[in-house]
Amino acid sequence: MQIRYLGHSAFEITDGKWNLLIDPFITGNPACPVKAEELHPQYILVTHLHDDHVGDTVAIAKRTGATVITSFEGGQALAAQGVKVADMALGGKRRFDFGLVRVTLAFHGFGPTGGHACGFVIHIGGKRIYHAGDTALFSDMKLLNGVIEEPGIDVAMLPIGDNYTMGPEDAAVAVEWIRPKVVIPMHWGTFPVLVQDASGFAARVRETGASQPVVLRPGETYTL
């Protein structure tokens, strides 16, 4: 299984059969190395409707026929634009043909429709991948460490950009709580206000021994 970082909070997950996109902010993303037309997902997961997360969702979904997994409010807004939607809500789980999705809490605004921002735990290919979305640090993250997700998270994507989300210090605390096998920092460096030292974050995580940090540059891939 491969996880390709597309810059900001956008990721592509492929396992040889399924192709998933998360928060596909492609067009207008100065860090993204690909064009939206190059992506061919079967599913798109959207954590909230801020432009830097919903991004090219509608255009990609219309072109490929992908199903968009998002919140109820976001689903209504996207369905009105002719997109096929599977809407969910905080705390919910749902099985899809590729695996299972759990919708997790995220402390952040949602966008023009209102509703709740979220994160996702994606079960695919025998792995559990947590994309936190845009969020502050919150103590319920501890539940992902073997409580509601047993035996725990294989890969966590956590924002470290600060200002709009938690910064590297709080993200390092999140890693200690979640204790994923691998952590990939996201939502950093895209714009001047998000400039951070990802290598410093990685060093902090290594010191704690809570996870293996993997800092991906846009376009790079991590293989599970």
UniProtKB/Swiss-Prot annotation:
GO molecular function, one term: hydrolase activity
Keyword entries, A-Z: Hydrolase
Origin: domain of life: Bacteria
Keyword Calcium on entry: no
UniProt-listed InterPro entries: Metallo-B-lactamas, RibonucZ/Hydroxyglut_hydro, UPF0173, UPF0173_UPF0282_UlaG_hydrolase
Keyword Hydrolase tagged: yes
Family: Belongs to the UPF0173 family.
Protein name, as recorded: UPF0173 metal-dependent hydrolase STH3160
Source species: Symbiobacterium thermophilum (strain DSM 24528 / JCM 14929 / IAM 14863 / T)
